[in-house]
């Protein structure tokens, strides 16, 4: 099965479960669970924004992700909820990170951007303690939202796991998710492959294939799809055979309903014979990542010739 067919089936599932991404009454609650409200909505917005750029306006998938973006924006009351979130949590960065996904697709709220710019100038904002990858993401969120970034990308990149070009054998789950998001931030979610510095691009060209194979073998479908998105975001992607094999394995993991579970354990626990066997939280992110990775892969055909001879690391 091709990446395109995986994408179409996965997007079918997302559209069928659109209402599960809707914000509930707890979206602004003091004890609300951000990971169950704003996180899924923000991830939906980011994936749809990226896919809308990667697909031609004449492509039926383009219209579908645009409709999903409109739905997601309506959930924020056309941006009115972002100033409310800021008033409740002035120094929380997740509202800006979610907003940046919308802003990158042209959905803007000038009032929120003005107030966010004021907060971003404070020492309290600049000194918020964060993991290095998150810091890089906030800097990029500021830029995409029209704010002046509070730091510089090269310095932020140097503090990340990937930026240090670590020994390849130190790769594990947490490092995998960190490196994928570093690449997403550097390339504006796959839009600008040249945003990956040459040394990182060369390093990933050599080590991404074995890491991807390891994750696929372990049935870590969510991380595997993120790594496939990284592969499609590099200046020079991996060998075609690597990607073809990976997509075949992802396709084999995809349920007939279009959903892809985050982990193989969800497949093992799924009751047989059900049309939609996975809990939303067990599959929504990996299914979104499959849409994202497939769109980038389809939009940017793998190069037949690859540069680079040495093996870094």
Region spans (language model):
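Intrinsically disordered, low-complexity segments enriched in charged and polar residues
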Residues: 1, 15-17, 29-30, 59-70, ...
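Terminal, non-catalytic domain-edge segments
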Residues: 1-57, 116-123, 160, 235-313
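N-terminal entry module detector
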Residues: 26-104
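Short beta-strand elements that form the blades of beta-propeller/WD-repeat-like
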Residues: 44-45, 138-139, 183-185, 227, ...
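Eukaryote-skewed repeat-based solenoidal scaffolds used as protein-protein interaction platforms
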Residues: 73-222, 232-234, 247, 251
